[in-house]
Amino acid sequence: MLILTRRVGETLMVGDDVTVTVLGVKGNQVRIGVNAPKEVAVHREEIYQRIQKEKGDEPSH
């Protein structure tokens, strides 16, 4: 795992097309903004896991 330190307003790049910007820090919460092409899905981990679980629950055709 790569660990980076960023301040509010600073950005990191993921590949050529995705940026992650630190928008704010309040207590133990960090607000981030993600810019990515439409074809790149961006989800919180718990939402992604729920989507994957629901895909697994669907009957096969």
From Swiss-Prot:
It is found in: Cytoplasm. One of its GO terms (cellular component) is cytosol. GO terms for biological process: mRNA catabolic process; negative regulation of translational initiation; positive regulation of translational initiation; regulation of carbohydrate metabolic process. It comes from Ectopseudomonas mendocina (strain ymp). Signal peptide: none annotated. GO terms for molecular function: mRNA 5'-UTR binding. This is Translational regulator CsrA. The keyword RNA-binding applies. Keywords: Activator, Cytoplasm, Repressor, RNA-binding, Translation regulation. A key translational regulator that binds mRNA to regulate translation initiation and/or mRNA stability. Mediates global changes in gene expression, shifting from rapid growth to stress survival by linking envelope stress, the stringent response and the catabolite repression systems. Usually binds in the 5'-UTR; binding at or near the Shine-Dalgarno sequence prevents ribosome-binding, repressing translation, binding elsewhere in the 5'-UTR can activate translation and/or stabilize the mRNA. Its function is antagonized by small RNA(s). Belongs to the CsrA/RsmA family. InterPro entries: CsrA (IPR003751), CsrA_sf (IPR036107). The keyword Mitochondrion does not apply. Homodimer; the beta-strands of each monomer intercalate to form a hydrophobic core, while the alpha-helices form wings that extend away from the core.
